[in-house]
A protein has these predicted regions:
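Bacterial N-terminal signal peptides that target proteins for export
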Residues: 1-9
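Short nucleic-acid-contacting surface segments enriched for D/E, G, S/T with interspersed K/R
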Residues: 80-96
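Bacterial N-terminal signal peptides
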Residues: 8-18
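Short, structured beta-strand/loop micro-motifs enriched in basic residues and often containing a Trp
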Residues: 71-80
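Short aromatic-glycine-enriched beta-strand elements
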Residues: 49-59
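Conserved hydrophobic positions within beta-strands
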Residues: 39-43
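OB-fold/S1-family single-stranded nucleic acid-binding modules
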Residues: 101-125
Length: 134
């Protein structure tokens, strides 16, 4: 009886531990497929941190400059896709396509970045649960 109870408690604990992890990786939890974005701006910061990288770009609007925070895949995934720390020097002008945060802020998940020379890179997060299919 004690062994069965231990197994049941352990199984329930594992199931409960998986739920927050799935929510963390669910595209639909934070981003809106109905809000595609395409912004062009200058890189002001690039954080290659786990579990996700962040690219900050200043986008000039009609009368002001707005900073967009673009979420990308982990540094390891980006390296495998061909992006390194040297790929995005501060001041680089890039175009980002992706999906805006549900809260309407200037935060988005990036799908692709395009450099001034036309070279395009996938940012690696579109396999997340609930993400739009390319």
């Amino acid at each position: 009886m004690t062994t069965k109870l231990t197994v049941v408690v352990a199984a329930v604990g594992l199931v409960l531990a998986v739920v927050p992890v799935r929510a963390h990786h669910a595209f639909a939890a934070e981003f809106d497929q109905a809000k595609p974005i395409k912004v062009q701006g200058s890189v002001t910061r690039w954080e290659l941190t786990n579990p996700h990288s962040w690219i900050y770009i200043d986008v000039k609007d009609a009368d002001k400059t707005v900073t967009w925070m673009i979420e990308g895949a982990s540094p390891n995934n980006l390296y495998r896709l061909g992006l390194t720390k040297e790929s995005l020097p501060i001041g680089s002008v890039i175009t980002v396509e992706g999906y805006q945060a549900k809260d309407g802020s200037t935060r988005a998940v990036g799908r692709d970045i395009v450099f001034a020379n036309g070279k395009k890179f996938f940012l690696g997060l579109m396999e997340a649960e609930g993400a739009p299919k390319q």
